[in-house]
Structures are given as structure tokens and as C-alpha cells.
Amino acid sequence: LEWDCWHTAEHIGDSLLSYAWQLAVQPTARYVRAVATAEKDASPAEVLEFAVTGGRILASMVRTSRAHVRAYHPAGMSDPEGFAGMGCYEALLHGNDIARGFGLSLDPPRDVCRRVLARIFPRAPGDLADVDPWSALLWAGARIELPGLPPGPNWPMHPAPRTS
């Protein structure tokens, strides 16, 4: 990752807000033409607040959007569940990037990791069935290597509804 922790947190907030905007407007061929940024003089706590705000707004949009809603994402049209999965993936992987930047580790709930991996990487190899779900998600995002598997593929996300 090339960003510092401040810019990584800003990216999380912008990504999550962008997903929320997609659900709100439901464009079919492009992203909503907007970018969210933290104020340049924001403290580290304030830029993390920006990221949390993006997550809460996305969660609200996911909860209030009907299941049939579809909106553009470069990896394919997504439903609310797909945007939720991609939002979790962004927050988890980049949250881990930030934690590592401070010499810490992130230890998310394994059930969340398992559900995110299954939802946005439905073609994940069966070799991952016995792998810790957090490690599998980090591997899928090319953050770590796993013994006996090729280097993490950094797969494109699959946001399309499960029936697609």
C-alpha cells in the first residue's frame, strides 16, 4: 500500500460514501460524479470519524434499499448486499493496513470474514475451506501468502447478485 494511514482512512470513507451514493441514485453506467475527502487539517481521530461516517451511511442505505435495487460498479452491477460486502472488504483490508502502519493487528470476527469472502469472491478455491477466514480474505486481497497456494490473486470483487 502506497498511502499513509491518514490517506488510507480517507480512502475508506470516500469508498463507503461512494457505495452509498450508488444505492441512493442507482446509476447504471458510471459512478455518481462526486468525491468525498476529509478536510486537510483533520486530525487522525477526525479522519477516522470520516471513515466511520461513510460506513454508517452505507449501512443505512443498505438497510433501506430494496433487494431489487441495482447500481453501477466497475466490476459489475451490484445489489445492496454486494455494496455491503464490498464496503466490509474495503473497511477490513484497509483497516488492517492502518493497524499494521501502527504496528498493531486487526482481529475481525471470523463469521464476518467468511461471509464477505463468500459474497464478493464466490469463485474462491475450495482450498480455502480449511483456512482461517480472515487469512483467506487477506490472501484474496493479495495482503499475505498462504502455504501451499500461489500468491494471493488480488481478485476483482464480484458485486453482482448471487443469482448472476
Predicted segments, located by residue:
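Active-site HxH/HxHxD metal-binding segment of metal-dependent hydrolases
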Residues: 14
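Short acidic/histidine-centered micro-motifs embedded in hydrophobic/aromatic stretches
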Residues: 11
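Structured surface interface patches that mediate subunit assembly and partner/cofactor docking
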Residues: 1-4, 18-35, 39-42, 46-164
